A protein has these predicted regions:
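Membrane-interface helical sensory segment of bacterial ECF anti-sigma factor regulators
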Residues: 1-17
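Short, solvent-exposed recognition patches
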Residues: 21-113, 117-118
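Surface-exposed amphipathic alpha-helical segments
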Residues: 119, 125-142
């Protein structure tokens, strides 16, 4: 299948809409998940969600930082939205895949949103972790 992303930058949100030409992926590969956890972060097992087409995890640290990982098989008209009012967006890459990085700085608290598509799977990582750790987490997902 061919997956096409349309990014729309609206006044208060950034919207990602996918269209699919062909038969979309219907299940995640077996054991598909992140394989790197930054030092000081712990998986919140109570919030973990996993089924055949999605996995969601959140991690927290002792100093109250948190980040979320969401990976979902893309179907036609899949939509995801993000804050655009306080976020600066730029193009980047994750494992040679085009990606979009959002940086939010509110009163000195910096957080990131990193989104990309690979092999019919939508990936997003949101939260308060270093930029280096953000990319290490992203590159570990398989």
């Amino acid at each position: 299948a061919v997956y096409t992303a349309l990014l729309r930058f609206l006044p208060i949100e950034m919207q990602v809409t996918y269209s699919v030409d062909g038969t979309p992926l219907d299940t995640l590969p077996e054991n598909y998940c992140d394989h790197y956890v930054p030092e000081g972060f712990v998986l919140d097992e109570s919030s973990e969600l996993r089924d055949s087409y999605q996995f969601f995890r959140s991690y927290h640290s002792a100093d109250d930082r948190i980040y979320f990982i969401d990976c979902v098989t893309i179907n036609d008209s899949f939509i995801s939205t993000f804050d655009n009012e306080h976020t600066v967006w730029q193009e980047t890459n994750v494992n040679d895949c085009p990606a979009t990085l959002g940086t939010t700085n509110i009163q000195g608290h910096v957080s990131y949103a990193l989104i990309w598509e690979k092999d019919g799977i939508y990936h997003s990582i949101l939260g308060e972790l270093s930029l280096t750790d953000l990319y290490l987490v992203a590159e570990s997902i398989s």
